Regions:
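OB-fold and OB-like beta-barrel modules that bind single-stranded nucleic acids
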Residues: 8-19
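Nucleotide donor/acceptor-binding cores
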Residues: 71
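Preference for bulky hydrophobic residues occupying beta-strand positions
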Residues: 13-15, 27, 102
Length: 200
C-alpha cells in the first residue's frame, strides 16, 4: 500500500519463527497482505463519514452559496508543489482572460502533520475571510496511502463547518478522501486547472 508502519495500523503478515542461542526468539516477516490494510483504512473512512452525518455537519459546506465564477481564491497547498504551480499558471492564463486574485496559505500536505497543518492554514484564511470567494485545497497524485492525512475526523469536521466554500483537488480520479466528501466541490487535479467554478 505504500503506508508506513505506525501505531494503529492493522496489518496481516506471514511470518516464520526462529530461535537463536544468543538473540533468542524472533519472527521473520516474509509477506504482507495489502488488501487487509486497505480494507481497514476504508472501514475507518466509513466510520468518520457516518459520525459526520450523525452530527449533522457532513453537507454543511456543500450548502454554502457559491459565486458563478469565483475570482478571489485562497489556496492551501505545499509551497513549491508542482500542483500549485500548475493551478496558478492555468488560472492566470485562462482563455477567457478572467482576472483572479489568489494567495497561498502554505501547509504540509503529506504525513502525520498534514491535518493539523491544513487546519492551521484554514485558521489563517478565516482571519482574512472577507477577502475570499472560496478556498482551494490542492494536493497532487501519489500513492493512496499518502492521502491518509485527508481521512481524519478533525480535518473533515473543520472543513465541513468552514464558512467559506472549499474546493478540493486531491489525488487522481480514482482517489476519494473524506475531505472530498465534506467539501463544497471536489475536482480532481487533472481537471482543477480548467474548472474555476463547481461542476454538477
Amino acid at each position: 500500500t505504500g503506508q508506513r508502519f505506525s501505531t494503529g495500523l492493522k496489518v496481516m503478515l506471514r511470518v516464520s519463527a526462529s530461535m537463536h542461542p544468543v538473540y533468542g526468539f524472533s519472527l521473520v516477516v516474509s509477506d504482507v497482505n495489502p488488501e487487509y490494510t486497505m480494507g481497514d483504512l476504508l472501514r475507518r473512512r466509513r466510520e468518520i463519514l457516518m459520525r459526520l452525518k450523525q452530527e449533522g455537519i457532513l453537507e454543511l459546506n456543500r450548502m454554502l452559496p457559491f459565486p458563478e465564477v469565483p475570482q478571489r481564491i485562497a489556496v492551501i497547498s505545499a509551497r513549491g508543489a508542482a500542483g500549485y504551480g500548475d493551478f496558478i499558471n492555468q488560472l492566470y492564463n485562462n482563455p477567457s482572460r478572467l482576472r483572479f486574485r489568489t494567495r497561498l496559505y502554505p501547509a504540509v500536505m503529506q504525513g502525520v502533520s498534514a491535518p493539523s497543518s491544513i487546519i492551521a492554514a484554514l485558521e489563517r484564511v478565516m482571519a482574512d475571510a472577507a477577502m475570499w470567494d472560496c478556498v482551494v485545497i490542492i494536493r497532487g497524485g501519489g500513492a493512496t496511502s499518502d492521502l491518509s492525512g485527508f481521512d481524519t475526523y478533525e480535518l473533515a469536521a473543520n472543513c465541513a463547518q468552514f464558512p467559506i466554500p472549499i474546493i478540493t483537488g486531491i489525488g487522481h480520479e480514482r482517489d476519494d478522501t473524506v475531505l472530498d466528501c465534506v467539501s463544497h466541490t471536489r475536482v480532481k487535479t487533472c481537471l482543477l486547472y480548467t474548472s474555476p467554478s463547481p461542476r454538477d
